[in-house]
Amino acid sequence: VDDVLANTPLFSALDAHGAEALRSSLSEMKVSKGQELFHEGEPGEHLYLVLDGKVKLGHGAPDGRESLMAVLGPGEMFGELSLFDPGLRASTATALTDAIVLALGNDQLMPLLEGRPAVAAALLQALARRLRRTNEAMADLVFSDVPGRVAKALMELGEKFGTLTP
């Protein structure tokens, strides 16, 4: 647990006292494969951190199709937009495997951000990385054909979750 947390943007920017305060505010959730953590269109009140397993973020179309936005593994955050924008969830989070996630409510994080600009900066950096990936995906939609986009997605998943075999 501590190894995963130490490598997340939220924890890496905290001193020992702040990290302990944040750790005590987290709620552990065990989710089964296929279980939704939240659904697109619901109000967002928590950010989540994958501790074990894999979670996908998807966006549904009116005709029932789903666009895969991200596959997340241990140490990755999601749902953090709800901390800064009280709007509705823009995606559905579903466990791809049995997973353990940590949840942090908006009301628990905001006091930790006050007086800790390094934590706020780490969150902004995580959001900026996500925006950069979104911009790249938009460019791919415009400039790449379907086989090219599928190949790129498979390569990215392989780099992120694959293991090298001789």
What are these regions (language model features)?
Residues V1-K33, S82-L83, G115:
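Cyclic nucleotide-binding regulatory module and flanking cytosolic helices
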Residues D3, L47, M69, V101-L102:
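A residue-level structural signature of the nucleotidyltransferase/glycosyltransferase Rossmann-like core
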Residues A19, A70-R132:
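Cyclic-nucleotide recognition modules
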Residues K30, Y48-L49, T94:
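Well-ordered beta-strand positions
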Residues G34, E45-G58, G73-G75:
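Glycine- and acidic-residue-biased ligand/ion/polar-headgroup-sensing regions
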Residues L37-E42:
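Short phosphate-coordinating micro-motif centered on Lys-Gly-acidic
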Residues P62-S67:
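Short alpha-helix-to-loop micro-motif enriched in aromatics/charged/Gly
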Residues L96, E114-P166:
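Polybasic "coupling" helices that flank or enter modular domains
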